[in-house]
């Protein structure tokens, strides 16, 4: 079974997806780690960022494995190596070009085959797993997301005004909605969860409730299909 959780930056998708996966006994698929892994591999190979053909070729040949919350590239565990600022600053070269994104999307589908997965992003329910059993679109107002981000930064010793965060966030939202491939949008069959004023625990419980309803409905449909055969 595949459960997708999409939404804008700052909506809390990653933390909620991990908690939901843990509660259900599912695996959490960190699709961002996959883009980071390919980015790291490109850096190790010294491929130029403007050499799109070579980038596509590398993404096509890369052997990605996601196991026990660890990411492997060509059988090498690089789960720590991909979390550097250098990798972060270059992800866009792999995440934006449509041809490269298609290759990594194919790898995500391959990894998810036959597994119970919770995955999050901005296009998981629309582009990557359009036939997912349950699709959640997690969102909040721009102001709410900016306040949450400010609190997260403060916990790590960084100080930024809500206004600064909001301006950067609005720009990213605009860019994410305008992307030619994998743009930010709710799938037509996604359940939209508006989280303004909700605590992380309240969001988790609401998402779990919705997911369990999806699981029950899926089981009922499967049983009905078996009866009619």
Curated annotation (Swiss-Prot):
Its main location: cytoplasm. Its EC number is 2.7.4.25. GO terms for biological process: nucleobase-containing small molecule interconversion; pyrimidine nucleotide metabolic process. One of its GO terms (molecular function) is (d)CMP kinase activity. SUPFAM superfamilies: P-loop containing nucleoside triphosphate hydrolases. Keywords: ATP-binding, Cytoplasm, Kinase, Nucleotide-binding, Transferase. It comes from the Bacteria. HAMAP family: Cytidyl_kinase_type1. NCBIfam families: cmk. Belongs to the cytidylate kinase family. Type 1 subfamily. This is Cytidylate kinase. It comes from Rhodopirellula baltica (strain DSM 10527 / NCIMB 13988 / SH1). The lineage of its organism: Bacteria, Pseudomonadati, Planctomycetota, Planctomycetia, Pirellulales. The gene is cmk.
């Amino acid at each position: 079974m595949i459960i997708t959780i999409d939404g804008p930056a700052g909506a809390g998708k990653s933390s909620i997806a991990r908690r939901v996966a843990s509660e259900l006994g599912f695996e959490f698929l960190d699709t961002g780690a996959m883009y980071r892994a390919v980015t790291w591999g490109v850096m190790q190979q010294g491929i130029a960022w403007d050499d799109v053909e070579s980038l596509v070729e590398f993404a096509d040949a890369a052997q990605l494995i996601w196991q026990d919350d660890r990411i492997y590239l060509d059988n090498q565990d690089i789960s720590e190596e991909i979390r550097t600022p250098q990798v972060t600053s270059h992800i866009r070269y792999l995440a934006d070009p449509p041809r490269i994104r298609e290759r990594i999307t194919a790898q995500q589908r391959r990894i998810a085959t036959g597994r119970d997965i919770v995955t999050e992003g901005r296009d998981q329910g629309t582009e990557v797993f359009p036939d997912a059993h349950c699709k959640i679109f997690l969102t909040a107002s721009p102001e709410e997301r900016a306040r949450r981000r400010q609190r997260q930064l403060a916990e790590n010793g960084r100080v930024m005004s809500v206004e600064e965060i909001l301006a950067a966030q609005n720009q990213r939202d605009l860019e994410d909605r305008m992307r030619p491939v994998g743009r930010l949008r709710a799938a037509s069959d996604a359940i939209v969860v508006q989280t303004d004023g909700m605590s992380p625990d309240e969001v988790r419980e609401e998402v779990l409730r919705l997911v369990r309803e999806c699981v029950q409905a899926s089981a009922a449909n499967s049983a009905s299909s078996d009866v009619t055969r």
